[in-house]
C-alpha cells in the first residue's frame, strides 16, 4: 500500500535514536525519547492560496528534517511507523 500525502502534508520516517550514551551506557527503549528528526518519504503538491494559486513545497522526498516533539500524527504503512504532518510543523532542513 502506498500513501500519498495531500495538499501541504508531508510523510516522514523518524531516524533511529542512539542506543548508547556517550559514556557507553545502554539506553532502554522505555527511557528513549522519540527523535525529532527524520527523512521525508513523500510530499503533497502544496497548499493553495484563496485565488487557487499553488504554493510550492519547500521540502522534497529524501530531505532530512527537524520537527517539533509533538508534531504530526503517527500512521502505519506496510508495517512501518511513519509521521504525517503539515509542512509548517517542520522547523528546518538538515544539510
Curated annotation (Swiss-Prot):
<comment type="subunit">
    <text>Heptamer of 7 subunits arranged in a ring. Interacts with the chaperonin GroEL.</text>
</comment>
<dbReference type="GO" id="GO:0051085">
    <property type="term" value="P:chaperone cofactor-dependent protein refolding"/>
</dbReference>
<dbReference type="Pfam" id="PF00166">
    <property type="entry name" value="Cpn10"/>
</dbReference>
<comment type="similarity">
    <text>Belongs to the GroES chaperonin family.</text>
</comment>
<protein>
    <recommendedName>
        <fullName>Co-chaperonin GroES</fullName>
    </recommendedName>
</protein>
<dbReference type="InterPro" id="IPR020818">
    <property type="entry name" value="Chaperonin_GroES"/>
</dbReference>
<dbReference type="GO" id="GO:0046872">
    <property type="term" value="F:metal ion binding"/>
</dbReference>
<dbReference type="GO" id="GO:0051087">
    <property type="term" value="F:protein-folding chaperone binding"/>
</dbReference>
<dbReference type="InterPro" id="IPR011032">
    <property type="entry name" value="GroES-like_sf"/>
</dbReference>
<comment type="function">
    <text>Together with the chaperonin GroEL, plays an essential role in assisting protein folding. The GroEL-GroES system forms a nano-cage that allows encapsulation of the non-native substrate proteins and provides a physical environment optimized to promote and accelerate protein folding. GroES binds to the apical surface of the GroEL ring, thereby capping the opening of the GroEL channel.</text>
</comment>
<dbReference type="InterPro" id="IPR037124">
    <property type="entry name" value="Chaperonin_GroES_sf"/>
</dbReference>
<dbReference type="GO" id="GO:0051082">
    <property type="term" value="F:unfolded protein binding"/>
</dbReference>
<dbReference type="GO" id="GO:0005737">
    <property type="term" value="C:cytoplasm"/>
</dbReference>
<dbReference type="GO" id="GO:0044183">
    <property type="term" value="F:protein folding chaperone"/>
</dbReference>
<dbReference type="GO" id="GO:0005524">
    <property type="term" value="F:ATP binding"/>
</dbReference>
<keyword id="KW-0963">Cytoplasm</keyword>
<keyword id="KW-0143">Chaperone</keyword>
<dbReference type="InterPro" id="IPR018369">
    <property type="entry name" value="Chaprnonin_Cpn10_CS"/>
</dbReference>
Amino acid at each position: 500500500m502506498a500513501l500519498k500525502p495531500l495538499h501541504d502534508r508531508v510523510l516522514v520516517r523518524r531516524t533511529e535514536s542512539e542506543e548508547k550514551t556517550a559514556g557507553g551506557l545502554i539506553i532502554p527503549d522505555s527511557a528513549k525519547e522519540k527523535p525529532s528528526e527524520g527523512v521525508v518519504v513523500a510530499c503533497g503538491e502544496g497548499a493553495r492560496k484563496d485565488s487557487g494559486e499553488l504554493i510550492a513545497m519547500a521540502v522534497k522526498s529524501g530531505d532530512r528534517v527537524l520537527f517539533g516533539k509533538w508534531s504530526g500524527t503517527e500512521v502505519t504503512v506496510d508495517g512501518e511507523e511513519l509521521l504525517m504532518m503539515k509542512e509548517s510543523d517542520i522547523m528546518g532542513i538538515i544539510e
